[in-house]
Amino acid sequence: LITDDTYQKLLSFKEQYEKEITEKQSSLGVLIGYIILTSILLSIFVIYLRNFAPDVFQKNKQLIFVTLWLVAFSYLTFLVEESGVLSAYLIPFCIVPIVIKAFYTDRLAMFIHLIIVLFASFITSLGYEFTFLQILVGIVVILSNIDTRNWSRFFYSMLFIFLTYALAY
């Protein structure tokens, strides 16, 4: 016969078992969701390069250069999040459009920046404020006339970027 004490233990085991099964299924669902979102972003990136930047898409060195930014900043965001001490706000995402803009078009710089920020927003737990702030700063970088050869204009652009961070945060 089953006593009340034994029944409570069995009920507790059942609840724990169901909780573990649910957590495994939900974590698997989340992983599948991230894989789908990442695949969609990468597909959009490849389609954009093929249609709007065919010179970059067809030359392996340029394609590797552009793709390396995605991989590097995604990995950097992952490392910062895993550390638990640092925040993803400390990662200088605005460097990407500055460098890409120096070598390629403004449109390509903005698109790569958007893809990097979206990847980072998948990795980090900071929410939409992080994504909004980084996209806003990327727009300021694209719109500001950053000329790395003219130091005064360069520092004015850096001041605009800093003010955007300060006001939006």
Listing of model-derived features with the role each one plays in the protein:
Residues 50-64, 68-169:
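Generic detector of multi-pass transmembrane helix bundles and their immediately adjacent loops
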Residues 1-55, 61-73:
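Conserved catalytic-loop aspartate of Hanks-type protein kinases
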